[in-house]
Amino acid sequence: RDIRVPGRDASGIYFAVDFLSRNTKSLLDSNLTDGKAVSAKDKNVVIIGGGDTGTDCVGTSIRQGCRSVTQIEIMACPPDKRASNNPWPEWPMTYKQDYGQQEATLVAGADPRRWLTTVTAINKNDKGEVVSVDTVKVSWQKTEKGFAPIPVEGTAETLPCDLLLIAMGFVGPETPVMDAFGMERTPRGLPLMATT
């Protein structure tokens, strides 16, 4: 999934999986000497997305020696304890830090996540390189189409950013392989399975 905001065409923006794959391949192939890795060293890194892939980006950025790392999460911070509507044996929807946030907390002294926040614009310099991102806090409100994140007035902020990583999740499976084999798909793009 991509982000559609002004400045998206700036250089220094990578999809999270590309960032992680290039770094891992360069490490395995050449111990990072082939120049193919995307380095976060001495950079202000902003990661859009709060899932496992975003966590991997936080951990990798910390290990590469980034100047700062901020993880933008559009959802609210979960509670410390289970809510009454989240009983066992359901997965506990509670606040936790995965390894990436734990490493960032040890290095920087705080959880890198900014909850209920979204990026509204990407700012670039004269060379077209990302230099900062504009953000705003959101409030989830019911609309005629369901719940939607609505910007909260007076919460705009600009964060320094030399490296922007997009970890916003996946929209669906890649279709070229399914097309090559003539596979039928559901309306959501998933392979249509035969029923018996």
Q: What is the predicted role of each segment?
A:
Residues 54:
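N-terminal Rossmann-fold NAD(P) dinucleotide-binding loop
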Residues 50, 73-77, 124:
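Cofactor-binding loop segments of dinucleotide-utilizing enzymes, especially the Rossmann-like FAD-
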Residues 1, 46-48, 119, 162-169:
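Short hydrophobic core segments
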Residues 58-118:
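Rossmann-like dinucleotide-binding cores of NAD(P)H-dependent redox enzymes
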Residues 3-7, 58-60, 176-180:
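Short amphipathic alpha-helical segments
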Residues 116-129:
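A conserved short coil-to-beta-strand element within the FAD-binding core of flavoproteins
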Residues 41-51:
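Beta1/beta-strand and adjacent pyrophosphate-binding region of the FAD-binding site
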Residues 11-42, 141-196:
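FAD-site-proximal beta/loop scaffold in flavoenzymes
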